[in-house]
Amino acid sequence: MLLPPIYYHHFQRCIPYVRALKLQEAIHALQLQQRSEFPASHQDILLLLQHTPVYTAGRRQTEADTAQERARLTALGADFVLAQRGGELTDHGPGQLVGYPLLDLERTSGAARGTRAYVERLQRVLALHLGEAHGLVTTPSEHMGVFLGARRKVASVGVQVRHGLTTHGFAMNVTREPLGWFGRVVACGLPDVEAVSIESATGREQRVGSEVPGIVERFGRVMEREMVPLEEGSGELAKLVHTLEQEFRGNERTLSSS
């Protein structure tokens, strides 16, 4: 059966994490409603963006567990959010390409429908991109994410699947900017692992926006789906996405300058 395309949208401005999370929840609810009322009518989408500085904790951590860290990290000027994704404490911010695929895994068949297989495909997208676009060799790891050596992590993966619909996703360090923020925490609960970026690994200046076309192409290749840009005015999904884009129109930090 020919599967419908995956739409994608690349935000041109840095988006606060909480606002992007609210968008994901709205899209998830829309997909669930449309799938119930008109099966196969709902659209899958890949959101690509940068966040303003934020530390996020995974669903296994609680307010009590993170109270001291929250106070310390917010004093540095970052937001702090408890998220309903897998994984532990991590950082998002400028210089990092974040991807939120909102997909219906029930559209796939067999073992590919499972969460583990989905996570493996996300990691494959990132590994392919790093190898083909930058000549970087990734290292298999028992830990979730993408590594350039046993102790050098360049990308994180943390997902949530409800009713077969995915939220959250991946974050890939592009410039050196995220590394300073990572240096203030034990990221992902791995004290012996350091955060690296494409820029630090290659020794060449990188721009986040330049990574988007390659990630989109390889995402479609691994998922075996056509990738189509989300056009403004093309239904409820587009309305939700472009409303958020307009909301942060005045944000000084844009992907074109990163």
Model-derived regions, located:
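C-terminal accessory segment of soluble enzyme catalytic cores
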Residues: 179-258
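Glycine-rich, charged/polar anion/phosphate-binding loops
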Residues: 153-161
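Short, acidic Gly/Pro/Ser/Thr-rich loop/turn segments
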Residues: 55-56, 164, 179-181
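Residue-level recognition of well-ordered beta-strand positions that form the cores
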Residues: 100-102, 158, 171-173
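Conserved phosphate/anionic-ligand binding catalytic regions in large, soluble enzymes, centered on
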Residues: 163-176
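N-terminal lobe of the biotin/lipoate ligase/transferase fold
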Residues: 1-154, 205, 239-258
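Active-site donor-binding loop signature of nucleotide-sugar glycosyltransferases
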Residues: 13, 159, 200
